[in-house]
Swiss-Prot record:
UniProt function note: Beta toxins bind voltage-independently at site-4 of sodium channels (Nav) and shift the voltage of activation toward more negative potentials thereby affecting sodium channel activation and promoting spontaneous and repetitive firing.
Locations listed in the record: Secreted
Record note on domains: Has the structural arrangement of an alpha-helix connected to antiparallel beta-sheets by disulfide bonds (CS-alpha/beta).
Species name: Centruroides tecomanus
Protein's name according to its UniProt entry: Beta-toxin Ct13
Tissues where this protein is expressed: Expressed by the venom gland.
Annotated family: Belongs to the long (4 C-C) scorpion toxin superfamily. Sodium channel inhibitor family. Beta subfamily.
Lineage: Eukaryota, Metazoa, Ecdysozoa, Arthropoda, Chelicerata
Cysteines engaged in disulfide bonds, as pairs: 29-78, 34-54, 40-59, 44-61
Length: 81
């Protein structure tokens, strides 16, 4: 019983950090234009996210891995710093 409580407490304390945002390529260009909510959700899940939705003509993904490249806002810099 003590072991079970220890495991549950450990899981709650460790947590899992995830990113939310607009996925971008190496040039900083937004990857997924928004077609439908279902399209965004499927593509965000393909990128190992928990899901996605349409937001300002771009897909906004939720629950992406920490190493995913994202922008917080849907401004498309595309190669500009």
């Amino acid at each position: 019983m003590k072991v079970l409580i220890l495991i549950i407490a450990s899981v709650l304390l460790i947590g899992v950090e995830c990113k939310d945002g607009f996925p971008v390529d190496s040039e900083g260009c937004i990857l997924l234009p928004c077609a439908t909510r279902a399209y965004c959700s499927v593509n965000c899940k393909f990128m190992k996210g928990s899901g996605g939705s349409c937001d300002t003509l771009a897909c906004h993904c939720k629950g992406l891995p920490e190493d995913a490249k994202v922008q917080d806002k849907p401004t498309n810099k595309c190669g500009r710093k």
